Swiss-Prot record:
It holds the Pfam family Chal_sti_synt_C. The keyword S-adenosyl-L-methionine does not apply. InterPro entries: Chalcone/stilbene_synt_C (IPR012328), Chalcone/stilbene_synt_N (IPR001099), Chalcone/stilbene_synthase_AS (IPR018088), Polyketide_synthase_type-III (IPR011141), Thiolase-like (IPR016039). It catalyses: (E)-4-coumaroyl-CoA + 3 malonyl-CoA + 3 H(+) = 2',4,4',6'-tetrahydroxychalcone + 3 CO2 + 4 CoA. Pathway: Secondary metabolite biosynthesis; flavonoid biosynthesis. Belongs to the thiolase-like superfamily. Chalcone/stilbene synthases family. This is Chalcone synthase 2. One of its GO terms (biological process) is polyketide biosynthetic process.
Length: 389
């Protein structure tokens, strides 16, 4: 008779969870940050709020964002005036948009990832879907399964309303699934659409205005599995270690609340300070076992919540400016796409590493770190090992 321990041993993969493909997608509507304040105050009938518009213009100018992509076009907003008002009851209109658009955008990214992977989609065993918006039943995971034509017995995991740290969460979950289920191939999808947070400006809620200056729409997808099939599957990054922690004394630092008016966004001023104060401890825990204490010797993928967070982390750790190059590039081109951001940065880094003739997918370096920051204040840490190009 076979023992339980023998069964468990047979169920486990031998090697680490490996990212085997990456795909990204954005809505067609590209928004230029320089002209966005004019559009935003016009479409929300707020042009009379001159001082507030000037404040918003300064926020946009300081954001280090050149462009963003948004599902909400001028036409859609004109058809849904309640979405443009500050705190007007509008959840029905928002839900009608996102329950369709979130899985659809996710499908676009997933199709690209599956194409790069090069294997039949029938080999996908697990699906992790993550989004901040559009809670529905059956969920976006079910809708994506139908849209892609995945097998009905794919094992699904749906993560709603986790926020900006969740790009790290999906990697942590995918790692555990891949390493504990021999032969598993996990499709990971983060799809974020800001239709649930868009609203007009208010003098009394400036944190909402910060969100209007930063957030953009995007979806990213990965294929994750252990023990890549030689000659067929091409590893991009290996996931070696993961952690999640709640930063001490950070309650209320970043909050979101689902209301009749959509998802509201609340932010304390010292979020960059809280992140930078706690990042050293997270790095020591992650890299001490590897005997790494020089954080300029590793590659960096940090959720770009905003330029102030990146600036303070760089300052605290005395990081060279090029360490955050891929992160800042994604912030500049796409804005803050919540959970999808770090996956976009992974894609940016491996592509630029190849284009620049570097030796590894991690900017020529062997080890790297990926950070997610979000509500809680929650910090996700993933230790990555690059692959030779």
């Amino acid at each position: 008779m076979v023992s339980v321990s023998e069964i468990r041993k047979a169920q486990r993969a031998e090697g680490p969870a490996t990212i085997l493909a990456i795909g990204t997608a954005n809505p067609a509507n590209r928004v230029e940050q320089a002209t966005y304040p004019d559009f935003y105050f016009k479409i929300t009938n707020s042009e009379h709020k001159v001082e507030l518009k000037e404040k918003f213009q300064r926020m946009c100018d300081k954001s280090m964002i050149k462009s963003r992509y948004m599902y909400l076009t001028e036409e859609i907003l004109k058809e849904n005036p309640s979405v443009c008002e500050y705190m007007a009851p509008s959840l029905d209109a928002r839900q009608d948009m996102v329950v369709v658009e979130v899985p659809r955008l996710g499908k676009e990214a997933a199709v690209k990832a599956i194409k790069e992977w090069g294997q039949p989609k029938s080999k996908i065993t697990h699906l992790i879907f993550c989004t901040t918006s559009g809670v529905d039943m059956p969920g976006a995971d079910y809708q994506l399964t139908k849209l892609l034509g995945l097998r009905p017995y794919v094992k699904r995991y749906m993560m709603y309303q986790q926020g900006c740290f969740a790009g790290g969460t999906v990697l942590r979950l995918a790692k555990d699934l891949a390493e504990n289920n021999k032969g598993a191939r996990v499709l990971v999808v983060c799809s974020e659409v800001t239709a649930v947070t868009f609203r007009g400006p208010s003098d009394t809620h400036l944190d909402s205005l910060v969100g209007q200056a930063l957030f953009g729409d995007g979806a990213a997808a990965l294929i994750v599995g252990s023990d890549p099939v030689p000659e067929i599957e091409k590893p991009i990054f290996e996931m070696v270690w993961t952690a999640q922690t709640i930063a001490p004394d950070s309650e209320g630092a970043i909050d979101g609340h689902l209301r009749e008016a959509g998802l509201t966004f609340h932010l304390l001023k010292d979020v960059p300070g809280i992140v930078s104060k706690n990042i050293d401890k997270a790095l020591v825990e992650a890299f001490q076992p590897l005997n790494i204490s020089d954080y300029n010797s590793i590659f960096w993928i940090a959720h770009p919540g905003g330029p102030a967070i990146l600036d303070q982390v760089e300052q605290k750790l005395a990081l060279k400016p090029e360490k955050m190059k891929a992160t800042r590039e994604v912030l500049s081109e796409y804005g803050n796409m919540s959970s999808a951001c770090v996956l976009f940065i992974l894609d940016e880094m491996r592509k630029k590493s190849a284009q620049n003739g570097l030796k590894t997918t991690g900017e020529g370096l062997e080890w790297g770190v990926l950070f997610g920051f979000g509500p809680g204040l929650t910090i996700e840490t993933v230790v990555l090992h690059s692959v030779a190009i």
